[in-house]
Amino acid sequence: EELTGYQASGEIRPSVDLGCDFIMVYGIDPTMPERIRQYREKGYVIHLMTGIAWGEYQEYLDGKWDGRKHWDEGQVDRNGKDVIHNPTVPYMVPTVSFSEYLTDRLKVAVDAGVEAIHVEEPEFWDKSGYSEAFKREYEIYYKEPWKPQHESLDAQYKCARLKAYLYKRTIDRVSAALKEYAKVTYQKDLRFYVPTHSLLNYTQWKIMSPEAELISIPTVDGYIAQIWTGTSREANVYEGVYKERTFETAYLEYGVMQELVKGTGRRMWFLNDPIEDLPSYTWENYEYNYRRTAVASLLHPHIWHYEICPWPHRVFDGRYPRFQPRIAEKIETSFETDQSKPIPQSYSTLLSGMFQLFGDMEQRDILFEGGTDGVGVFMSDSGLFQRTFPDGIVDGEELGDRFRAAMHKNSGNPVDEEAAARLMKEIGEKDSLMYDFIQSAAFPNFFGVAMPLVKYGLPIHPVQLDNVRRFAGYLEDYKCIVLSYEYMKPDAPDVNAAVVSWIREGGTLIYVGDGSDPFHKIDAWWGQRGYANPAEHLFELAGLGRDPKEGVHEVGAG
């Protein structure tokens, strides 16, 4: 059933022969067929994984694939600087040509007999959007001249939405073409998966990605929820304190990811990573956070498939902490120090037990003691599109750099709580800093409503607002849901209609918001109908008028 697996880029050796069900052989370089052969001989089911936004695609960029250079398809920021994964690997604008190249390269994996293909991390950075390739895509899609996203709210929202669409289009094209190739050539049913960060993490890090839109691609068979210490340790604010809350954040991240498969029959693997991408932390720090992400994943019992350990060679053969002197330049080369040590035996033993446990989590008897089930907080893909305010709205200092300084990013140290406390005090005293705080990686508008419920002990779920249009009865398992349109927007009026219908049938909606979000002013359906914001339309549908008083209102049976 392929309950557990991992991804690996190198050849098999005893330290990474973990006895799981499947292996995702990583990368489509010339060594791929030999690596596939080695793992297959060990009895593993073979998948292939590669990046869809970045990778060693120099032959495409240099014009060796089709005779035309494609360096203009790298992502570029407003200052003309390339947005890179490392100095020789740009993040791509996924053009039609690029999708054809990926399809051609991935046919080799189909020829080698893989059972499934994973294209990971469809990522278009919010700060990107200035390359010639993106300008062309904008003009094709919107049928109007390209507009720089930093100049207006509408331009920001439209550019961000297009970035997510472009990766949806690429995944749709590549998956359909490869499935047809496998069927016609080998009479084989190839499976196709998308490993992706959570909607919450991409919203924090300002990376555009299709997320819930992947549900509408029929040739996608499932996903890997790429949640680990590196995503979940991103600090947030609770009761005015800015700090890492790895368990709580991971719990919410895993929760929103299962919304991609709810009611679809598709597969979801939850990833757990015993370390993280940054090698500068100690083994004690890695284990401390691994325990928290692992427990968080186990608190979502409707998912029982796991990627148990990405890159096991760096766990079982690595020595930490390590020093990365040029990480600011995206050069990931690291060096041992006199503090570097191999994995402690006690941690290795714990991991061996966890790997076995993850293969036996299809448990039918589920009980949450002392908690109230059926409580949710709405989240939407549209939250991605309004994470950066255009020029003229943020008048305060750039808080992003100050938050990063408080976190000692890349140093292996936790948040400097004294520096963070000074920063939070300053934000509370200066209105000019509030919008900058809202657009920071702390993502306070979401965590401000979700974190108190988690801290109280409620087993809450992030609820994918977009899905109320896709699935009848999508909200029927919920008794109470928190909604705010201050950090996201409903795509169409029928979203509000579905929410009101759920309320009338007995649901309780807690709406949080004062209508102050500048993105209410974009050219969207609510403004075209004369509403100042989408909440006014929601309230009117509920029979409360456009501006009901704060308090409790009965609507039907809810």
Briefly describe each language-model feature range.
Residues E1-Q7, H47-G51, H118-P122, Y157-M208, ...:
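Aromatic-lined carbohydrate-recognition surfaces of secreted/lumenal glycan-active proteins
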Residues E2-Q38, K42, R105-A116, S216-Y223, ...:
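Catalytic domains of carbohydrate-active enzymes, especially glycoside hydrolases
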Residues L3-V16, D21-R35, A53-Y57, W125-D126, ...:
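Acidic-and-aromatic substrate-binding clefts and catalytic sites of carbohydrate-active enzymes
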Residues G27-H85, A116-D126, A182-V194:
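Glycine-rich, aromatic-flanked loop segments that form ligand/cofactor-binding clefts
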Residues L48, I52-A112, Y138, P145-A164, ...:
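Active-site-adjacent "subsite" loops/lids of carbohydrate-active enzymes
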Residues W54-I84, E120-E151, I207, D391-R404, ...:
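Aromatic- and acidic-residue-enriched segments that line the glycan-binding/catalytic groove
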Residues A182, F192-P444:
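Hydrophobic targeting/anchoring helices
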Residues M488-G558:
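A glycine-rich, often tryptophan-bearing local segment used as a flexible ligand/cofactor-contacting loop or short
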